[in-house]
Amino acid sequence: GSGDNAGFFGIDSIELKCVLSAENSKKIYLNKEIEESWTEEDIELFHKLSFEERVFNADYLSTEFEITKFLVDFAKTNKAVLAGLEYRVKSPKSLYNKLYQRVEKSFFDSIADVIRYTVILEPKEYVEQIRSVTDALYEKNWKIYSLKNYWVNDSFPYNGVNAKFKNSRNYRIEIQFHTQESFDVKMSEEDHKLYEQRRVLEPGCDEYNRILQLQLKLYSDMEYPENIADLEKI
């Protein structure tokens, strides 16, 4: 039924749970549904973030409610599918790793994929519906600042459109638009195995190029969205 998703993701009535900060007992409000998906390690690492980072993260997560609700409603009325919605928010563990374990620390507010959605569209409506989503988000003050159309790049083994948006508070979200076929290939074991093999090779060597061609073939053997080259004009 139409209400199934909404209940499962707890977004019809978002519940913000109050978490006290150890340092100065200021209150942080967290989206309860997201927090409940965290492991013990996630909770531990969340508390290892600085207070500012925790507040920023919690605040960020309370803004994603509006986008999630909009995309769920959009999917219901437009034959679209939201894939892996429960994974839309980067966990504290991967966030902590990105901030503290890498050689180059990322600035917290420049992490574009703390909140990431995957939207699967029909090839015939694909371009039109991406425009509908970006227009509607623009109305909600989410402006697009990066649009990558991989369908028109024959040398890169991936098909899809990756769009990044930010609002006036510099919060960022990413939406990946797929067709069912491009999503299935991206998630396939075959593509993953080839990627893992290629990743450790020297770019340009014979074996690297051979594996790359196999990956490119996976992506070229599918129906391409109508008028996909026109998408640059967003």
Please identify what each model-predicted range represents.
Residues Y100-I234:
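Long beta-strand-rich cores associated with HINT superfamily self-processing modules
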